[in-house]
Curated annotation (Swiss-Prot):
Known function: One of several proteins that assist in the late maturation steps of the functional core of the 30S ribosomal subunit. Associates with free 30S ribosomal subunits (but not with 30S subunits that are part of 70S ribosomes or polysomes). Required for efficient processing of 16S rRNA. May interact with the 5'-terminal helix region of 16S rRNA.
Domain of life: Bacteria
GO molecular function: ribosomal small subunit binding
Disulfide bonds, paired cysteine numbers: none
GO biological process: maturation of SSU-rRNA
Sorted UniProt keywords: Cytoplasm, Ribosome biogenesis
GO CC annotation: cytosol
Location of the protein in the cell: Cytoplasm
Protein name according to UniProt: Ribosome-binding factor A
Originating gene: rbfA
NCBIfam families in UniProt: rbfA (TIGR00082)
UniProt-listed PANTHER family: RIBOSOME-BINDING FACTOR A, CHLOROPLASTIC-RELATED (PTHR33515:SF1)
Length: 125
């Protein structure tokens, strides 16, 4: 139980540090999109060697893939930033992935809204 708690705290701290790194990053390719990018969650392996970083991006499919690929290219920068800001024996290897959970949540909300609208239309008849 204690080990799981420590792992969750580490995941939370890495997520916070990566968000800071993103905001401090000075790159003209990513600057216009910073407000559309969110580090939604981090999952660290039990041995703390790997961290799966889930990134959510508002925009179309191509933009989401471009951002995840960009993060993969810059993972050395992010890993160095994590190593400097979190006291660990070794910084975990970061693996960036697209978080589709937020997109699914928005889609479900849209479907529920359309159902409400159709029910209102049926009630008026």
């Amino acid at each position: 139980m204690k080990q799981e708690y420590k792992l969750k705290m580490l995941e939370s701290e890495i997520r916070k540090v990566l968000s800071e790194a993103l905001m401090e990053m000075k790159d003209p390719n990513i600057d216009p999109m910073k407000s559309l990018i969110t580090i939604s969650r981090v999952e660290v392996s039990k041995d703390k060697r790997y961290a799966d970083v889930y990134v959510s991006v508002l925009g179309d499919e191509a933009k989401r893939k471009d951002v995840v690929n960009y993060f993969e290219q810059k993972k050395g920068y992010f890993r160095t930033y994590v190593a400097k800001n979190i006291r660990m024996y070794t910084a975990p290897e970061l693996r960036f992935k697209e978080d589709k959970g937020i997109e699914a949540t928005v889609r479900i909300g849209q479907l529920l809204d359309s159902i409400k609208e159709s029910q209102k239309g049926d009630d008026n008849k």
